[in-house]
Curated annotation (Swiss-Prot):
Organism whose genome encodes this protein: Bovine leukemia virus (isolate Australian) (BLV)
Transmembrane segments: 436-456
Gene encoding the protein: env
Coiled coil: 330-376, 388-420
Region (Immunosuppression): 365-381
The keyword Zinc is annotated on this UniProt entry: no
Disulfide bridge partners, by residue number: C212-C215, C212-C392, C384-C391
Function text: The surface protein (SU) attaches the virus to the host cell by binding to its receptor. This interaction triggers the refolding of the transmembrane protein (TM) and is thought to activate its fusogenic potential by unmasking its fusion peptide. Fusion occurs at the host cell plasma membrane.
Binding partners and assembly: The mature envelope protein (Env) consists of a trimer of SU-TM heterodimers attached by a labile interchain disulfide bond.
Protein name (database record): Envelope glycoprotein
Higher taxonomy: Viruses, Riboviria, Pararnavirae, Artverviricota, Revtraviricetes
Keywords associated with the record: Cleavage on pair of basic residues, Coiled coil, Disulfide bond, Fusion of virus membrane with host cell membrane, Fusion of virus membrane with host membrane, Glycoprotein, Host cell membrane, Host membrane, Host-virus interaction, Lipoprotein, Membrane, Palmitate, Signal, Transmembrane, Transmembrane helix, Viral attachment to host cell, Viral envelope protein, Viral penetration into host cytoplasm, Virion, Virus entry into host cell
Residue window of motif CXXC: 212-215
Region named Fusion peptide: 304-324
Gene Ontology cellular-component annotations: host cell plasma membrane; membrane; viral envelope; virion membrane
Lipid-linked residues (S-palmitoyl cysteine): C455
Length: 515
């Protein structure tokens, strides 16, 4: 019977990215093996659409041997080929795939052993897109990885990236061969956003490591760019070791930056030659048993040092106050000078206006006289009786302008009274006069403090000595052995204590609060 051919017509899928990221701290052990298992469960999604999944490890390596930069001590080289004297970055190739047929389940051992300084990327393994010509192929839906860490001291990140139509995922991480070690529960969900799944795995990490504190750096997700073969440039920077190390970053057109750092987009995804990657804020685990703080220490200070500090602070505050006062005085003086200039301009304008008004009044009076002469020449009376005006005058009033003469002496007297006792100038400019005033004020204040400082120091030291002498004194109590007794009491009774007290002292001790 011929095999039924599946229809290649696809509905519009909802493509969603699912990324599981877990950040752990690689301990300084000879070897640690972790078993990572990832399962994909949506059969309809697996059979009807292309499936792509990728696993990667990023190691932020901290070198222990400074003189071995940029390699760890006795680190293996993954290939004999080299670029500029350095070996190529290790990219595990795709495993167990056929171009037009079924794929077998792949198990690959990844073994990072202190590679380059900086952030490196390992894909173990990597699936390419399935061929569009064969829609009946069996796609890998279960991946098991064994991670062997050898003398790697730093932070590494495990990342799975899956795309498709609502995939069902199951994730588990176990340490081998010690079962009691951290065992992360499985994560089952229809679709988990990347940020939420990362937070869930972070909580599982906290439960798995009860003796460690989780440090989450809440900075923006800036991440070092990935090192790619034949696309590296050398740049000098702080590095991860002392002294400064050479760090190699990617320089590709996709990143379009020369600073060596990549700011991801809003979805925290960026493209590389091997596929997409997800950037998340880094976390680290800190052992609480080794984290200890030094005990606080108390150091007694001498009274002289405290007194000197107090005097210095008082002198500084007084100097600041004098400087502020001098600055305020200078500002007020400048304001008065500006007001005087405005006053002079106003007086000049009023005088000019008064002169113009006098000219107009003279013209009007001249016209009046001409009209009166004309009316009388024609046989009429003067202008006012002819037009029935009750009041006719030819005198120009000039009494109001006399008040302006009193304004200038008054302003000069107010300015002189305000500047007392600094109303001397010796022919100097304003800023020189203010500088001399400020220097003299500070000099007089320093002389006053020099005269009063010995008295203040003597008073304070005598007061402290008096307080120390008034401290309560307790008499010394001694108990001679009794020759007629084989038993010596460890704690004497109350009558024995009072019998050995000094007769000049009362039989009680007055307890009072400290002064």
């Amino acid at each position: 019977m011929p095999k039924e051919r599946r229809s290649r017509r696809r509905p519009e899928p909802i493509i969603r990215w699912v990324s599981l990221t877990l950040t752990l701290l690689a301990l300084c052990q000879p070897i640690q093996t972790w078993r990572c298992s990832l399962s994909l469960g949506n059969q309809q999604w697996m059979t009807a659409y292309n499936q792509e999944a990728k696993f990667s490890i990023s190691i932020d390596q901290i070198l222990e041997a400074h003189n071995q930069s940029p390699f760890c001590a006795k680190s293996p080289r993954y290939t004999l080929d080299s670029v500029n004297g350095y070996p190529k970055i290790y990219w595990p190739p795709p495993q167990g795939r056929r171009r037009f047929g079924a794929r077998a389940m792949v198990t690959y051992d990844c073994e990072p052993r202190c590679p380059y300084v900086g952030a490196d990327r390992f894909d173990c393994p990597h699936w390419d897109n399935a061929s569009q010509a064969d829609q009946g192929s069996f796609y890998v839906n279960h991946q098991i990885l064994f991670l062997h860490l050898k003398q790697c001291h730093g932070i590494f990140t495990l990342t799975w990236e899956i795309w498709g139509y609502d995939p069902l995922i199951t994730f588990s991480l176990h340490k081998i061969p010690d079962p009691p070690q951290p065992d992360f529960p499985q994560l089952n969900s229809d679709w988990v956003p990347s940020v939420r799944s990362w937070a869930l795995l972070l909580n599982q990490t906290a439960r798995a490591f009860p003796d460690c504190a989780i440090c989450w750096e809440p900075s923006p997700p800036w991440a070092p760019e990935i090192l790619v073969y034949n696309k590296t440039i050398s740049s000098s920077g702080p590095g991860l070791a002392l002294p400064d190390a050479q760090i190699f970053w990617v320089n590709t057109s996709s990143f379009n930056t020369t600073q060596g750092w990549h700011h991801p987009s809003q979805r925290l995804l960026f493209n590389v030659s091997q596929g997409n990657a997800l950037l998340l804020p880094p976390i680290s685990l800190v052992n609480l048993s080794t984290a200890s703080s030094a005990p606080p220490t108390r150091v007694r200070r001498s009274p002289v040092a405290a007194l000197t500090l107090g005097l210095a602070l008082s002198v500084g505050l007084t100097g600041i106050k004098v400087a502020v006062s001098a600055l305020s005085h200078q500002r007020l003086t400048s304001l008065i000078h500006v007001l005087e200039q405005d006053q002079q301009r106003l007086i000049t304008a009023i005088n000019q206006t008064h002169y113009n008004l006098l000219n107009v009044a003279s013209v009007v009076a001249q016209n009046r006289r001409g009209l009166d002469w004309l009316y009388i020449r024609l046989g009429f009376q003067s202008l006012c009786p002819t037009i029935n005006e009750p009041c006719c005058f030819l005198r120009i009033q000039n009494d109001s302008i006399i008040r302006l003469g009193d304004l200038q002496p008054l302003s000069q007297r107010v300015s002189t009274d305000w500047q007392w006792p600094w109303n001397w100038d010796l022919g100097l400019t304003a800023w020189v006069r203010e500088t001399i005033h400020s220097v003299l004020s500070l000099f007089l204040l320093a002389l006053l403090l020099l005269f009063l400082a010995p008295c203040l120091i003597k008073c304070l030291t005598s007061r402290l000595s008096k307080l120390l002498r008034q401290a309560p004194h307790f008499p010394e109590i001694s108990f001679p052995p009794k020759p007629d007794s084989d038993y010596q009491a460890l704690l004497p009774s109350a009558p024995e204590i009072y019998s050995h007290l000094s007769p000049t002292k009362p039989d009680y001790i007055n307890l009072r609060p400290c002064p």
